[in-house]
Every structure is written in C-alpha cells, then in structure tokens.
Amino acid sequence: MLLEGKNALITGAARGIGAAMAEVFAREGANVWAFARTPDARFEARLAMAAGKYGVWIKPVYCELTDTAALKEAFRQVMADKQPLNVLVNNAGIMGEDRMFQMTSAEDMHRIMDVNFFAMVEVSRLATRLMARNKCGAVVNIASVAGIEGDSRLDYSASKAAVIAATKKMARELISVGIRVNALAPGFTDTDLVSGLSEKVTQEQLGRILMHRKARPEEIAGVAAFLASDMASYVTGQVWRVDGGML
C-alpha cells in the first residue's frame, strides 16, 4: 500500500475529488482527517464505511476554511489526536459563475480567491508547521489545467494559477525541513463543478481530450496518492497534469 502508516489531512473531502481522495487514501493505508464545511450524516456514514473496510481511522473535521478562527480550532482538533501529520492535500475549491472577463467584478475575484488561494495558503501554513516538527511531509495542492492554460473563468483560472505559483515557492522554502510540495492539475473531471455546463461546452471540452472522456475523481485521487507517497520521494516543486491528453 502506498500510504501505509501515514496520516493525511484532506480539505474539501465531502464530495467530488475530495471524497475520492478520502476513499483512495484509506485504501492505500492512510488514516485521514477529512475536512468539510458543514456536518453531514451521509458524509460521516461514508467515512465510517471506508474506515471499516480498509482498517484505518477517518475523522470528519468541520470548519469554514476562510474563517481563520474556525480553521485554527479545527487544527486544535487535529493536534488533540496526538498523531503526526504526514500528508496535506489542499483540495477544497469553488468555481463560481461563468462570466466573460469584462463582466467579472472585483467581488467575484475576491470570493473565489478567498477559498481557492488564501484559504489554501493558511491551511498550508498551519499544516507545515506540524510537519516540520518531524522534518518530513508531503503537500499536494489541487490546481487545474485552467491555471496553466487560462481557458476557463477569469477568477477560477487566476486562483489556480496562484496555487501553482505558491506551490513552487513553498517547495523551495520547505524542502529545508524535509517537506515536498507538488501541484496536481486535473483536466475535465466528472464532478459537481462541471455538471452544470451546457452540452455545447461539454462537447467542446471533450473534443480537446485525446481520451474523449471526463476523468473519474478516483483517477485524480490515485495520482495524488502517488505524489503523497514515498514512491515520489524525489519529486517536488512540480505541476502534474492529469487531463487525458488535453491539447
């Protein structure tokens, strides 16, 4: 198992790629703190089922990531478990409305950046302080091909480009305390974020992909598990595209 004996913190774990991350990481032997925004009985039942199936513990932790006080309280819950934090996956994110550049307001930008970038930075600051105590760790930031290509909404693309830039800076700085930092850039993935797209836009996107289909969330999660594992011990500061051959 890729992650046997490791403890991972995954944000945005209630649905989509984050839910797949919790399942795949548990399958690969990791214990998981599964961060989500609001309490949900079905979410907790799913975590309990996965924990029993794979013989690990998975604990739900609820907080609004953009609320600094709530986030610090969530990390106090993590620290109360007295288990080392080995892996952080910054997965939480939102996409926002589909607007043209000229129609995107500063308010739109702030709302997306607060969740997709600033919260990611604050989570990383808190998590890597814990990792640094053991002089080792791995961070996987979930970016997007939109942050590379700039072909999506302005606010979303800009937020993911910022995640990529931060990944490189974090990698340079944190390697001194044994922490690797990489970004994973998914392409067109079958999640709630893209379910509302029109059939026309969906077909346009699929037409750019050599594999002619959306990614499954578990396919993205599998690559994240590799980057978090010791199998990727010589990989840091990189952006891994997982896009089915998007040209």
Q: What label would you give each PLM region?
A:
Residues 124, 159, 167:
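Active-site helix of classical SDR
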Residues 7, 14-15:
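Conserved glycine-rich cofactor-binding loop
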Residues 2, 136, 213-242:
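C-terminal substrate-recognition "lid" of short-chain dehydrogenase/reductases
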Residues 144:
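Residue(s) in the substrate-gating loop at a strand-loop-helix junction
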Residues 28-44:
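Conserved glycine-rich Rossmann-like NAD(P)H-binding loop of the short-chain dehydrogenase/reductase
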Residues 129, 172-176, 233:
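Alpha-helical segment proximal to the catalytic Tyr-Lys
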